[in-house]
Amino acid sequence: MNVQYNLEQIEKQLKTHCEKGNISTLPNVIAVTKYVTIDRANDAYNAGIRHFGENRLEGFQLKKEALPDDIVMHFIGSLQTRKVKEVINEIDYFHALDRLKLAKEINKRAEHKIKCFVQVNVSGEDSKQGVALKDVNTFIETLEQYENIEVVGLMTMAPLTDDESYIKSLFQSLKNKRDEIKALNLNYAPCTELSMGMSNDFHLAAEEGASFVRIGTKLVGKEE
């Protein structure tokens, strides 16, 4: 597994698809290291990656401790309220804010303002977590009461399908909703970012203006 080579190939694809979508800025690549060892995560760091994503408490703590201090740590998975206190002040971004109970606990435990993505279930699948697209505005309005939460953007996970036009339509819907929220000029919810696209569909997300793509197996492989 050559992480440097993988990153170069991913960046080439991102550049190609950003040009195709008339997007001037390439998305940040988050190395999703939940299935790999600390050594492999270090390979990603040495290849130039600075954004790392974990979705399990144990893995997050191990990687956070082992990697250099200049990394940007993203917690990208669903977070149980009882585990908020162990995570929230150790991360730079939280990608899965999807319920008020969680927002309340984050606000209570946070020692500073936390950069959060509201997770949106754009596809409407029962198996997917997230706020329904039609409920995003109302959900974000209710977050105004929580002084330690800053809604920096929206996040979604597309379904596993070969139908690229369908996936693109979902990413377009998220982008449109982001633009709608951004236009409201809310101090607590600037909503300038988009977290979307994984190993199978990051190229489509790039075309639609993703700010962050979350790439695991295609970048660092899978060891566990």
Role assignments for model-derived ranges:
Residues 1-200, 206-208:
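Conserved alpha/beta-domain cores
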